[in-house]
Amino acid sequence: MSEIFSPAQRYELWLRIELIVTEGWAEIGEIPRPAVERLKRARVDAEHIARLEERVGHDVVAFLDSLAESLGDDARFLHRGLTSSDVLDTALALQLVQAADILLNDVDRLSAVVRRRAIEERATLMAGRTHGIHAEPVSFGFILAGWLDELDRERQRIVTAREDVRVGKLSGAVGTHATVDPRVEEMALAKLGLRVAPVTTQVIARDHHAAYLTTLAVVGGSLEKFATDIRHLQRTEVAEVREPFGQEQKGSSAMPHKRNPILSERICGLARTVRGYAQVALEDQALWHERDISHSSAERIIFPDACTLLDYMLRLMADIIEGLTIDRERMRANLYRSGGVVFSQRVLLALVQKGMSRQDAYRVVQSAALTALDDGQDFRTIVGEAPEVRERLTTEELAELFDPAYYLRHLDVTFERVGLEPVALAPSPARGAAQGGGS
């Protein structure tokens, strides 16, 4: 990713654009074909261009001056009818397309890891939590299936952003083609693999770029969501999962026992940075008239940084999930830590099915559940002693309501919907043994 946005690569793209434009001029008979062939001998010298830029204060002028020193009279055919932004914006489009391709590969790798772990943990029971409070049983594989579904959407968003930003312009100083034949633009951009922006000013409208960076921010938000879940599940009081932690790694300069979720925390911090860059891109939409240069300085930072950061975040998240320790015994123990109140809705629905009004059934079940929570008692015992329950449910019927497998009975459907094999997989004994015991 860093190579895409390196000065040397940027100059190579500029040269490629300039040469392809001369080919377009030659096609319509405006430039001698032999001169075009001689121009192809041009080579960029990034260090020399940088020195020239310090003197002239303009990057494209420095680039052209550097080429002119070695090309002689043929250099006059370069940049014919173009303005700097023709080269800059077209090159930026190529860079962002290349960056999107890398990000798509990153998403594919992460999705493959999540897919495999979801299948492995399909039947790993744990407490589902809403508002941070125990709700109903889920499986860790179910949670990972949700992540996979989200990654599928993020992939499509990147594909859409890539196509949206895949536009170039070679239309001159204010976009009117006064000095560039539209045929040259069409031929050149076709060779570059870019679409022609139908209407431009001196620049391509920045809604394309704002949408691109906003997409990166949304993808980063998904990674932050995954990382936040991991951080919560690694808390000492929960201890259901654990990030990879090296044998010689240290968690604190003061406390030797510390094993902190720093990788997930890092992703959360970097997601905020990418969101900040998206805000800058949104601000860059409102340029003066046919163009000002207020966007330029910001874009030199936000595009390389945001693309590089998201590339790193996607790779890091894949490594985290690949090496994530899952404590299945702790997950099951935590599920029952709240005294079995996670089964309260099943009791409620069973009573309603037996003829109680929903309001009365809710009152009975809630009273038993809150007593169990407040006094640290077993919910099934307390609710089973309620007269309204004894009158309607046998001991066997009540026991069936506390079967956690009930909550996973439609998991095959969920897995099929995200393209996962609907096969009931028991947790791997080898993996479970290696990963047993929370921190």
Regions found by a protein language model. Name each.
Residues 24, 66, 70, 113, ...:
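Generic, well-ordered alpha-helical scaffold segments in large soluble proteins
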Residues 185-278:
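Acidic, glycine-rich loop-and-beta core segments that form the ion-binding/anion-interacting portion
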Residues 84, 176, 189, 196-203, ...:
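A structural signal for small-residue-enriched, beta-sheet-centric alpha/beta enzyme cores
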Residues 1-171, 177, 181-187, 196, ...:
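A helix-coil-helix interface module used to build multimeric assemblies
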Residues 1-13, 17, 37, 41, ...:
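Glycine-rich cofactor/substrate-binding loops
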Residues 97-108, 115, 145-148, 152, ...:
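Short amphipathic alpha-helical segments with heptad-repeat character
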Residues 142, 210-218, 346-354:
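Short, well-ordered beta-strand elements within core beta-sheets of diverse protein domains
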Residues 31, 238-239, 357, 434:
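Conserved hydrophobic residue
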